[in-house]
Amino acid sequence: MKKILKLLSIVIMLTVATIYTMPTKVMAFGPSSDEIYNGIDVSGYQGNIDFGKVKKDGIQVVYIRSSEGTNYIDSKFEQNYKRARDAGLKIGFYHYVTARSVNQAEKEAQFFASVISEKVADCRLAMDFESFGNLNKREINTIGLAFMKKLEELTIKEVVLYSNAYTASRIWEGEVTKYPLWIAQYGVYE
């Protein structure tokens, strides 16, 4: 019995790993655009990036993490923005949401909007909300929706929901699903 459970666990892990590395299409631009772009997301975790090489490798769009919570600006935000813009890449911004209430979500949207206010975004703004702590499904959806609505209100820009495949299929529901979905592909470094 233990061998069967162990084998089943391995099969499940391999299936999940395969799902996370499958290519997906992203609608980072408006629905009137049928063109598909190759893109990446970047943050301070990647260190110094040669965006000229990135462009030469066929990447057309770079989503840059600008902020997290209500007071953290990504350590490479300004540098990534300038270098990606200088390389002629299309740019989008994303914010890593840490809110645990609607009030906090709205404050995070205000912070995100203020951080990117002097920058030019070629793509929709993105909400990256993936660390839920003890929140239940209803709370997650309420907080995510509050963030996206407040962000749209403040910026007059469309928003996309950045999510992994598991969360997209099991957590997001209701009004949140009216927003376009950008499925993350963790572990893809080509």
Show which residues each predicted segment covers:
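Boundary/entry segment of secreted carbohydrate-active catalytic domains
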Residues: V26-S67
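Conserved, mostly hydrophobic/aromatic
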Residues: I40, V54, A84, M127, ...
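Sec-dependent N-terminal signal peptides of Gram-positive bacterial secreted proteins and lipoproteins
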Residues: K2-M27
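Mid-chain, structured segments of secreted extracytoplasmic proteins
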Residues: Y81-E106
